[in-house]
Swiss-Prot record:
GO terms for biological process: photosynthesis. It is found in: Plastid, Chloroplast thylakoid lumen. Residues 1-26 are annotated as: Disordered. It comes from Cucumis sativus (Cucumber). GO terms for cellular component: chloroplast thylakoid lumen; photosystem I reaction center. It comes from the Eukaryota. Belongs to the PsaF family. This is Photosystem I reaction center subunit III. The lineage of its organism: Eukaryota, Viridiplantae, Streptophyta, Embryophyta, Tracheophyta. Probably participates in efficiency of electron transfer from plastocyanin to P700 (or cytochrome c553 in algae and cyanobacteria). This plastocyanin-docking protein contributes to the specific association of plastocyanin to PSI. The keyword Chloroplast applies. InterPro entries: PSI_PsaF_sf (IPR036577).
Amino acid sequence: DISGLTPCKESKQFXKREKQQXKXLE
């Protein structure tokens, strides 16, 4: 589980980045 390896702070940033990538792909 990635969320378990990274701090909550980084996890949120990662989620944001993932959403942005998803928008770019769509």
